[in-house]
Regions:
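Canonical Rossmann dinucleotide-binding motif of NAD(H)/NADP(H)-dependent dehydrogenases/reductases
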Residues: 1-30
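Short C-terminal tail/terminal secondary-structure segment
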Residues: 89, 220-246
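Substrate-binding pocket helix/loop in short-chain dehydrogenase/reductase
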Residues: 90-92, 96-101, 191
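Active-site helix of classical SDR
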Residues: 115, 150, 158
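Alpha-helical segment proximal to the catalytic Tyr-Lys
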Residues: 120, 162-167
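Residue(s) in the substrate-gating loop at a strand-loop-helix junction
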Residues: 134
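C-terminal substrate-recognition "lid" of short-chain dehydrogenase/reductases
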Residues: 202-226, 231
Length: 246
């Protein structure tokens, strides 16, 4: 398709799969990641894949990243805001103001700033913004305030951007559930039983939805949950073999 795609956190997991799938669709991809060696090795695998090293919490880094992407691809058609700081810490761990703010900078402020920096190019090209949230935007475990706040925020940012930038730019969000981004290959029967679809998700499950949304012209402002139905299961202690242990 020869589009110009930029992806944050593209060196591993979901972001890496997104990069691969756009490349295989015939696009050019420029990604930013903080893990330099891992990303350099990945970028060597594809001719039309370009890597920029940096921390997206820094707005100057984002500006330079966009300039680099334009230098390499000469256009930007799609922005995928994938990167986040996923450490599960919050009030029970006495997470500091500074640590909370950094998590917001990576997971919420950076997606806004990157969207702002790319706005004119996206409008010109009738582009797309795809934000990656999480089912943590809607349900929580203890001690997860920082991460949950970024994911709830990016859901709201999605529909706000969709209204501001439409009809020229369509903006959507994906909320993944349990996605295996590790080398673990085996899971217990109980793991599978917790998910109505009967499997643990893969980065490909999320990437497929990203590419799908980039092909549509009548979906915008939406957050689409991709979690195998896990968040839809109603659980009561002692019901249907579910037990809460204290």
């Amino acid at each position: 398709m020869n589009r110009g795609i930029i992806v944050t956190g593209g060196g591993h997991g979901i972001g890496k799969q997104i990069c691969v799938d756009f490349i295989q669709a015939g696009d050019k991809v420029c990604f930013i990641d903080i893990d330099e060696q891992r990303s350099i090795d990945f970028a060597k695998e594809y001719q039309n894949l370009f890597y920029f090293n940096g921390d997206i919490a820094d707005p100057l880094t984002l500006k330079r990243f966009v300039e680099y992407a334009m230098e390499k691809m000469h256009r930007i058609d799609v922005v995928v805001n994938n990167a986040s700081r996923s450490n599960n810490k919050g009030i029970l761990s006495s997470l500091t103001y500074e640590e909370f703010d950094y998590t917001l900078s990576v997971g919420l402020k950076a997606p806004y700033e990157l969207s702002r920096l790319c706005k004119d190019e996206l409008i010109k090209n009738k582009g797309r913004i795809i934000n990656i949230a999480s089912t943590r935007a809607f349900q929580s475990e203890p001690d997860s305030e920082a991460y949950a706040s970024t994911k709830g925020g990016i859901v709201a940012l999605t529909h706000a951007l969709a209204i501001s930038l439409g009809p020229d730019v369509l903006v959507n969000c994906i909320a993944p559930g349990w996605i295996n981004v590790t080398d673990q290959q085996e899971f217990s029967r109980e793991d599978f039983a917790a998910i109505p679809a009967g499997k643990v998700g893969t980065p490909k499950d999320i990437s497929d939805m990203v590419l799908f949304l980039c092909q549509q012209d009548f979906i915008t402002g939406e957050t689409i949950t991709v979690d195998g139905g896990m968040s839809k299961r109603m659980i009561y202690h002692g019901d249907w073999n579910w037990f809460y242990r204290l």
